[in-house]
């Protein structure tokens, strides 16, 4: 498992190096589609709600396993300054905690789109691509004022 995460991190680093010649875009610039966010919402209801709660606020009930908020300000503060490629690698290889790495690439990217939608980030015309170079070029940041 550790070697798999290390390999994914190295691939992500290579993608970041490749993307550095292109001006990054913000998660606030419509980087996913509404349909992608909806697929992520359906996945969340089936596989994520028991840990992250129905509103993605993290463990809100004593019977829930400890888990962080994965949307809104808490999520943005934790991930600000990183790119979506890093988030994709994290979700893809560590979720769900009881069966890490079992989400497909598509499920992982759809889950991220849902996190963005719940965080108030606007949908756009193009889906988040399962492409480390493209994802490395999308910056997670607080909403511009």
PLM features: what roles do these ranges have?
Residues 100-145:
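Flexible coil segments in periplasmic/lumen-exposed cytochrome c-class electron-transfer proteins
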Residues 40, 44-55, 111, 115:
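The canonical Cys-X-X-Cys-His
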Residues 31-34, 55-90:
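Gly/Gly-Pro-rich "capping" loops immediately C-terminal to redox-active cysteine motifs
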Residues 38-49, 63, 81, 105:
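Sequence context surrounding c-type heme c attachment/ligation sites in exported
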């Amino acid at each position: 498992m550790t070697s798999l995460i290390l390999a994914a991190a190295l691939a992500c680093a290579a993608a970041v190096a490749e993307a550095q010649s292109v001006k990054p875009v913000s998660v606030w610039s419509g980087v996913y589609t509404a349909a992608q966010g909806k697929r992520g919402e359906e996945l969340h209801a089936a596989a994520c709600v028991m840990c992250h709660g129905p509103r993605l606020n993290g463990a809100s009930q004593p019977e829930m396993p400890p888990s962080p908020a994965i949307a809104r300000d808490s999520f943005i503060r934790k991930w600000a300054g990183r790119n979506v490629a890093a988030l994709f690698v994290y979700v893809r290889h560590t979720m769900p905690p009881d069966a890490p790495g079992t989400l497909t690439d598509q499920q992982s990217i759809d889950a991220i789109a849902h996190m963005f939608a719940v965080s108030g980030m606007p949908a756009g015309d193009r889906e988040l691509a399962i492409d480390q170079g493209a994802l490395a070029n999308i910056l997670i940041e607080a909403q511009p004022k």
